[in-house]
Amino acid sequence: MATSQIAIIVLLGLLVATNIHITEAQIGVCYGMMGNNLPSHSEVIQLYKSRNIRRLRLYDPNHGALNALRGSNIEVILGLPNVDVKHISSGMEHARWWVQKNVRDFWPHVKIKYIAVGNEISPVTGTSNLAPFQVPALVNIYKAIGEAGLGNDIKVSTSVDMTLIGNSYPPSQGSFRNDVRWFTDPIVGFLRDTRAPLLVNIYPYFSYSGNPGQISLPYALFTAPNVVVQDGSRQYRNLFDAMLDSVYAAMDRTGGGSVGIVVSESGWPSAGAFGATHENAQTYLRNLIQHAKEGSPRKPGPIETYIFAMFDENNKNPELEKHFGMFSPNKQPKYNLNFGVSERVWDITNSTASSLTSEI
């Protein structure tokens, strides 16, 4: 075989390997709709596709958005809103109806990957009244998904925040608060038994803005030049990893060492509060996208991560919540971000690879 032909084969192998790596580390983006000036659902999904964003989180089963997603090949976290959790927990008939109307009617044309039953429900926040219904709702939706024949395709989980963590420093000593163990232990057990990941919302911004005297901005933005936290043999240069690994440690302590984590939200506001600037937000998002390929000291490897959020949403409060978007409502990007090789480039690569192969 000629040297040039060998070189072409090696090149093709590298292209395939690169494509796989990009897919594994692909970042998703949360599609919030709390704005009165946002683009149509079809425009939004087209924007996802044009920017090579292949994963999306929906906070409720908006049928306009789900219809726009048909045939897009975008993977979806589909939210079951907090307002429906108690109702779903009360009987299988409600869970079956919800799954039929919001999942089965769209599958497989919409690639629903996870169902997030509730968002940030916690016994120690304003959602405490829903906490007793969380696990029954999870179980009912899980059973309904199984009855619909989708148990091997769609995982059922819930999205939590860091308020459930009692100790997070050092990360290896992470643990759930004692007063929420009645809530977290059954969730971790459910996820372990069903082999589903825990969805976790991780925001270094809020930790930094609440404790700027103890947490440095570079540590929060992935830009610290040196190790900030030495935890045994593990070294931490960024707060994101430390927060993530503290949750892994907490689950390990409750029998959930085999449970994976999906970072279901992470972002940085560009205005509206302390430390919320365009420069900081761009730095954080750029570095988060890159870091998702690498993993944490405790769990190396790609981290499935969803950026919050696609758009600035002017109906949210307080003020900083209006400024988490990567795009303005007119679809103009606020930052220069790269989500990997564009679909157009990969089309060119694939056609070139095909023609090269035919010549060997």
Curated annotation (Swiss-Prot):
Which residues get modified to Pyrrolidone carboxylic acid?
Q26
> Where mainly found?
other
GO MF entry, a single one: glucan endo-1,3-beta-D-glucosidase activity
Q: What is its EC number?
A: 3.2.1.39
InterPro entries, per database record: Glyco_hydro_17 (IPR000490), Glyco_hydro_17_plant (IPR044965), Glycoside_hydrolase_SF (IPR017853)
Sorted alphabetically, which SUPFAM superfamilies does this protein's record hold? (Trans)glycosidases
Proregion positions: 341-360
Name of the protein: Glucan endo-1,3-beta-glucosidase B
Organism, scientific name: Solanum lycopersicum (Tomato)
Taxonomic placement: Eukaryota, Viridiplantae, Streptophyta, Embryophyta, Tracheophyta
